[in-house]
């Protein structure tokens, strides 16, 4: 793809936007970057770009910003309903997202992972399987390291394992991973995608360009994910926790199998919980189909310790264990976290409202969630739902900050309980992202020891 001397407009100056600017300048493009935020909010991004020949536009979008532009590249945070996209379409400009641009520039095969929950764990686990098999791998995408960087750095004999979000899939055109994988699909981001059907269809775009010689890995147990199989031109490789699938990945008599090959005893997989068994099956399937030996897969499953902010053990204080599941950004993710812990729980939940319903979330409390500490935009919404299902009002506490939530949780918890931060919501009402929220939780827990 020729970008030299091309006038390129980059919309959005988050992590992906800054990376796009760097790469496009490196490839000889004339870059104009735009974000509606002000200089104070974009301090870090502007600091990173200050030595690059990038023209910066901030504040309210003006049509004149697109004058002379030949290509518009969108950061994942920019909606296709935005004024920028509408104007660019009216002007007949080519519009790409980061994933599409990275694919067109990459010399290395891409193994793409999506799903509502488990993406980061599965992507990290798969990357580790490649490493343990002695392959040079770049783990990138929605996981933190921009895919556009990996695309430029990886050679034809290397491998890119990419976590891909629904926001990123909105803008794919020719994107064709060597192997794609959908772990699961449950309602999320309905504030952006409007309907669950639309959200599920966007997830399915991960494999829409794959050919007959390639593979798509799908969760047999999830009816929405499995229902997408009819759209696949690639070979479908299923995985299941519940059913023996001779031509897929499955569990039989307490062992994980890949087709007819016994891999590992399920109880020997280091990361706990049924949801992590699902992640293990998904990652193992992609690794197996890419030619990685079963020994390397088994070693990784036995030793991989999980990732930060996913049911991460933080500390034990006075017989009370604290777990950070800040990545629980939707109800289904938090349901899985509650199910994974075996002790009584004091739950800290609430945050930015993405339009989620909390009925199924509250139904899993049963007698396991002893106390409920609520924060953020959705605090009243979750409380109302909990009361609807007869959760005791005296066991619900609304507080103003995460630090206060941690102190209150410690106060009401008993020896043998687990305090679990699993918000079932995004972090954007109080924090920049779920990582910042998770770090704030861990600091607040450590402050209890002072």
UniProtKB/Swiss-Prot annotation:
Catalysed transformations (reactions): UDP-N-acetyl-alpha-D-muramoyl-L-alanine + D-glutamate + ATP = UDP-N-acetyl-alpha-D-muramoyl-L-alanyl-D-glutamate + ADP + phosphate + H(+)
Top-level taxon: Bacteria
Cellular compartments annotated: Cytoplasm
Enzyme class: ligase
Keyword set, alphabetical order: ATP-binding, Cell cycle, Cell division, Cell shape, Cell wall biogenesis/degradation, Cytoplasm, Ligase, Nucleotide-binding, Peptidoglycan synthesis
Biological process terms in GO annotation: cell division; cell wall organization; peptidoglycan biosynthetic process; regulation of cell shape
Keyword S-adenosyl-L-methionine: no
GO molecular function, one term: UDP-N-acetylmuramoylalanine-D-glutamate ligase activity
Main location: cytoplasm
Residues that coordinate or bind ATP: 115-121
Pfam families in UniProt: Mur_ligase_C, Mur_ligase_M, MurD-like_N
Signal peptide (UniProt feature, chain positions): none
Pathway this chain belongs to: Cell wall biogenesis; peptidoglycan biosynthesis
Keyword check for Nucleotide-binding: yes
GO cellular-component term (any): cytoplasm
The protein's role, per its UniProt record: Cell wall formation. Catalyzes the addition of glutamate to the nucleotide precursor UDP-N-acetylmuramoyl-L-alanine (UMA).
Family to which the UniProt record says this protein belongs: Belongs to the MurCDEF family.
Name of the featured protein: UDP-N-acetylmuramoylalanine--D-glutamate ligase
Gene name of this polypeptide: murD
